[in-house]
Design a protein with these regions (language model features):
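Ala/Thr-enriched low-complexity intrinsically disordered regions
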Residues: 2-3, 30
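Metal-dependent phosphoester/phosphodiester hydrolase catalytic core
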Residues: 37-370, 377-381, 389-424
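Boundary at the C-terminal end of the N-terminal hydrophobic targeting segment
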Residues: 33-35
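Local alpha-helix boundary/kink/capping signal
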Residues: 8-9, 297
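Bacterial N-terminal signal peptides that target proteins for export
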Residues: 9-23
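Sec-dependent N-terminal signal peptides
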Residues: 22-31
Length: 424
């Protein structure tokens, strides 16, 4: 009887030990295998782009590392920063985020998740922004990105090949409509894999919201009706409209065209104050999704200018940026290429007017544009996938180029003053 009891206990102990070993091996496998299951890695800024970088990564493991190891390229010693977890809508994806602070301006860094690296190819790289405009700064911008994964990869790779300091993408990223998590998985993978510069840098994102981030497209709630946008992306002001400042030389103002914040009211009041506070910034660009001066989608029997949101933008926002002057305005949503004439107070003004550039065709199918001469506000328009490349210089000039998805330049504007003349 005793022997049977001992054997039974021994068998139970062995089974328990085996179960513990299996669980331990599964845990190790999850930790070791998280990098193979990495869904996405993307960079953003929550504060000063010259001394900080926010690293975000998404995977499928609850036990993934929270640590980031980083160092200046060429240095031997690693620094470590520990991030935080965040939920991604109602999905099993696991998000982590860490903001690196105290970085040197205009400096290349290499980093990895969970450990240091032995070879540069094992990790990722980024570059901080310059504190002053002591070299030309270049960014790409557009919107309306994802139709097919193949086309998205091509468009992202094309944008990264221009070697931008960052990408300003304003709306309709994954076309998930606030519910389709599989679309976000593919979008995140594409950005991580394809949006890498020629020297191996991950391109930082400056993000705006569009109708396809929101359940219902417009007049959503915060953050309930845009759960992926608000969980994935953290902005300097923790909302879909905000300003990002680069020293004294550049400000980017990102707005929400009635997707989760109304155009009039609080947002319009904030815009007026933000522009007033930045009257001494050298360059100021404004970006948003739905256009004030579009190329399509007009109400039945009317022009794109007659769309309700277009009218609201011109009534509630345009007076503020005309009052203080801006470098240019970027619009999206209409799935075309467009450059307006210089416009001022809703009229053509080739001397003091503002350029409105768009119209959101990063990687989606394009639409029909008005016949030449039929839309008084348009200088040039066509159905063509593209990104805008912007280069600013310390002498106050900038070059803005339209680059199609095959890498061909097909339009260019030389802007000789940093900001338009303010309306008195």
């Amino acid at each position: 009887m005793t022997a049977r009891v001992v054997i039974s206990w021994k068998q139970s102990r062995d089974k328990l030990n085996l179960s513990m070993r299996i669980l331990f091996l599964l845990f190790l496998s999850a930790v070791a295998g998280w990098s193979q299951d990495l869904v996405g890695l993307y960079l953003m800024w929550q504060s000063d782009p010259s001394t900080t970088m926010t690293i975000n990564w998404v995977d499928l493991h609850t036990s993934s590392p929270l640590d980031v190891h980083y160092r200046r390229v060429g240095e031997a010693a690693w620094a470590k920063a520990t991030g935080v977890k965040f939920a991604i809508a109602d999905t099993t994806m696991q998000g982590r985020r860490v903001e690196l602070k105290g970085l040197l301006p205009d400096t290349h860094y290499e980093f990895n998740i969970g450990k240091g690296i032995e070879k540069p190819a094992e990790g990722w790289r980024f570059r901080t922004m310059p504190r002053d405009l002591n070299r030309p700064v270049r960014f790409v911008t557009g919107g309306d990105m994802f139709s097919t994964r193949l086309k998205l990869d091509k468009a992202n790779s094309n944008a990264a090949s221009l070697d931008p300091d960052f990408a300003l993408i304003v709306g309709d990223l994954a076309y998930a409509n606030g519910v389709a998590s599989n679309r976000w998985v593919e979008w995140l993978k594409s950005w991580m894999q394809a949006a890498v510069s020629p020297d191996g840098r991950v391109i930082p994102l400056v993000i705006g919201i569009g109708n396809h981030e929101v359940k219902g497209g417009y007049n959503g709630k915060i953050p309930d009706d845009a759960p992926f946008f608000y969980s994935l992306f953290t902005t300097p002001e923790r909302r879909a409209y905000y300003a990002l400042d680069f020293g004294d030389y550049l400000s980017i103002l990102v707005l929400d065209t009635a997707h989760t914040n109304p155009i009039p009211g609080a947002q319009a009041e904030w815009l007026a104050k933000a522009l007033a506070a930045r009257k001494n910034k050298q360059f100021v660009f404004v970006g948003y999704h739905y256009p004030a001066y579009g190329t399509t989608k007009g109400p039945k029997g009317k022009t794109p200018l007659d769309a309700a949101h277009s009218i609201e933008i011109r009534e509630h926002w345009m007076p503020s940026w005309e009052k203080y002057g801006v470098t240019a305005v970027f619009e999206n949503d209409h799935h075309n290429y467009k450059r307006t004439h210089r416009l001022r107070q809703h009229k053509r003004d080739d001397t003091n007017g503002i350029l409105y550039l768009g119209d959101g065709a990063w990687g989606v199918a394009t639409r029909t544009v008005p016949e030449p001469g039929t839309a008084w506000w348009l200088a040039k328009a066509e159905g063509r996938n593209h990104v805008w490349e912007v280069k600013i210089r310390n002498n106050g000039t900038s070059t803005i180029r339209a680059i199609d998805i095959d890498g061909k330049e097909f339009d260019k504007v030389e802007v000789l003053t940093p900001r338009t003349k303010p309306v008195e």
